[in-house]
A protein has these predicted regions:
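Bacterial Sec-dependent N-terminal signal peptides
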Residues: 1-24, 29
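Short, glycine/serine-rich, charged loops/turns that create anion-binding
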Residues: 12-13, 47, 264-265
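Short, glycine/charged-enriched secondary-structure capping and boundary segments
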Residues: 20, 56-57, 85-86, 272-276
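A conditional alpha-helix N-cap/helix-loop micro-motif detector
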Residues: 21, 53, 146, 237-241
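Structured, acidic catalytic/metal-binding patches in enzyme active sites
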Residues: 28-41, 46-232
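A cross-kingdom marker for long, charged
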Residues: 231-287
Length: 287
């Protein structure tokens, strides 16, 4: 069984022309050329990482300070974010977890959730499965208080009085998750219970690739793990990458911009770096 649960963690919670023919490495990239009057930058994040693995590549803070604005996948500085998220996490049909799972699966997941998260699943009423995944994912990181690159960049941007914007909205992100069938979402919940050790190992492997700044290998691993997800790779990665390009182009033509998005979106033939290359921009790794 592929570790779909871990892929959801990596993707949501939250190349120069010469270099494209080589192994792509580096989390920080410079965007230039194609008539731009000033460079912009794109940084590949991982949404949750243990403090002892957290690092900021040399030059990242300097480039963020040089930029005039900061873009994340979504605007994490939106004062309405928490309220919007809570609303979107609730099932529109009012169904609770026990209504969409068979009795044995519900019992197994309830016990796992209580033991590992320390909460009763009944606390959340008609919450979507993704809420339970979001809370359970803390366990897979292997540390009690994982750090977030998104929170780091929000803090740095505020310190530098930079405007913080989003490439998409929280509504856009949840709409992607809502395209998964109920059966798919239940299977992801049960993977948390039945594939705990394998999921933890997969996550460790991804963190290792991330700290090595090997975005191509990371993208390949994510793609392999998504086999069998019935079109969700296209929804979670490819379409979102395509949707971001016009927003990126519009902004880099006007201001030097620092973008921070999941590292899994950067590599590959359909990744953000390749798509920008195809538009005529020069992508240079600042590793």
């Amino acid at each position: 069984m592929k570790n779909k649960f871990i892929i959801l963690i990596v993707l949501f919670f939250q190349l120069s022309q010469t270099y494209a023919q080589q192994t792509q490495k580096g989390l920080l990239w410079e965007i230039s050329g194609n008539g731009l009057s000033q460079p912009s930058y794109v940084f590949g994040t991982i949404h949750l990482i243990c403090p002892d693995k957290f690092f900021v590549p040399k030059g990242t803070e300097e480039k963020l300070k040089a930029a005039q604005q900061v873009f994340l996948e979504i605007d994490m500085d939106d004062p309405q974010m928490m309220m919007k998220t809570q609303k979107l996490m609730m099932s529109s049909d009012g169904k609770k977890l026990k209504d969409i799972m068979n009795e044995s699966d519900y019992q197994a997941f309830s016990e796992y959730f209580k033991k590992n998260v320390g909460m009763d699943v009944t606390m959340f009423g008609p919450a979507k499965p993704f809420l339970y995944m979001s809370l359970a994912m803390m366990k897979s990181t292997g540390c009690p208080m994982p750090k977030s690159y998104e929170e780091y960049f929000v803090k740095e941007a505020k310190t530098e009085n930079k405007e913080i914007l989003g490439l998409e909205t929280i509504e856009d992100q949840m709409a992607v998750m809502d395209k998964a069938t109920t059966e798919q979402q239940v299977s992801w919940l049960m993977e948390i219970v039945n594939e705990t050790e394998k999921s933890n190992e997969t996550y460790k492997q991804m963190i290792d690739l991330y700290t090595k700044q090997d975005i191509e290998a990371l993208t390949k691993m994510i793609s392999e793990q998504m086999v069998g997800m019935k079109g969700m790779e296209e929804e979670m990665l490819d379409k979102r990458n395509q949707n971001w390009i016009p927003v990126i182009e519009q902004n880099i033509k006007q201001k030097s911009t620092f973008f921070a998005v999941g590292a899994g979106h950067l590599g590959g033939e359909k990744g953000v770096l390749k798509l920008l290359q195809q538009k005529g921009y020069i992508l240079k790794s600042l590793e």
